[in-house]
């Protein structure tokens, strides 16, 4: 989750203890550069992708500016071959020291890093739970709610998601073909779950209770 408080001050303090890694759109970050316990997206948008069955690609995390990317030693559990790919030109700040050392030298920044890492782990666990849903439309609406909870804006109609992800990117996140996503979005709109306007999606309900998203947002 995008950790609140990713201010210019935090950015400058992170640069003092991190190695900056620039990644061009469409490229993968070299594994040799991702050697710290955690990295932070300081610019652009990146995803963590793995190769799935039948030559498909699966996105297991989508990250934007301020998001933390926990880098487990030996790779991502259950996701062999995972790589960090830039959806746009991006910059990562890879922590080049132990978390404990940061807590000792800058307790405030260390606490911020720990919160950001906890949010990242919680978001990953939610993504895993969504992936286990058997029905495509259910997986899709849960994923849209997850994205809207992180990046959406409350409007009178619901929570507006202006993330500008493509149908292919949504499909990669929940294990579905692009064509299936297009059909599922249409069905969700017919059911009143969402409103689709070009590449903007408005999520009418952020949970399974009756009423629009603005009732609880």
Feature annotation, model-predicted:
Residues 149-217:
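Phosphate-/nucleic-acid-contacting segments
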Residues 1-35, 68, 73-76:
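Cyclic nucleotide-binding regulatory module and flanking cytosolic helices
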Residues 61-122, 126:
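Cyclic-nucleotide recognition modules
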Residues 108-175:
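Polybasic "coupling" helices that flank or enter modular domains
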Residues 22-23, 40, 50, 86, ...:
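Conserved hydrophobic "DFG−1" position in protein kinase catalytic cores
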Residues 21-22, 52-69:
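Short acidic-glycine-tyrosine-enriched beta hairpin
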Residues 35-49, 64-67:
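Glycine- and acidic-residue-biased ligand/ion/polar-headgroup-sensing regions
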């Amino acid at each position: 989750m995008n950790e609140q408080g990713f201010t210019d001050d935090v950015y400058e303090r992170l640069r003092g203890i991190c190695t900056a890694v620039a990644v061009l759109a469409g490229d993968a970050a070299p594994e040799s550069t991702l050697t710290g316990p955690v990295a932070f997206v300081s610019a652009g948008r990146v995803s963590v992708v793995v190769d799935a069955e039948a030559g498909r690609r699966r996105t297991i995390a989508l990250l934007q500016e301020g998001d933390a990317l926990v880098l487990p030693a030996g790779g991502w559990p259950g996701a062999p071959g995972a790589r960090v790919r830039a959806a746009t030109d991006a910059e990562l700040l890879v922590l080049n020291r132990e978390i404990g050392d940061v807590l000792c030298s800058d307790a405030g920044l260390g606490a911020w890093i720990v919160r950001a890492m906890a949010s990242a782990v919680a978001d990953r666990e939610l993504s895993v739970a969504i992936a286990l849903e058997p029905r495509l439309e259910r997986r899709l609406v849960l994923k849209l709610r997850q994205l809207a909870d992180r990046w959406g804006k409350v409007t009178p109609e619901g929570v507006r998601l202006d993330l500008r992800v493509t149908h292919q990117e949504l499909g990669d996140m929940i294990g579905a073909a692009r064509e299936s996503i297009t059909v599922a979005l249409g069905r969700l709109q017919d059911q009143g779950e969402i409103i689709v306007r070009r590449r903007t999606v408005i999520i009418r309900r952020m949970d399974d209770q009756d009423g629009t998203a603005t009732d609880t947002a």
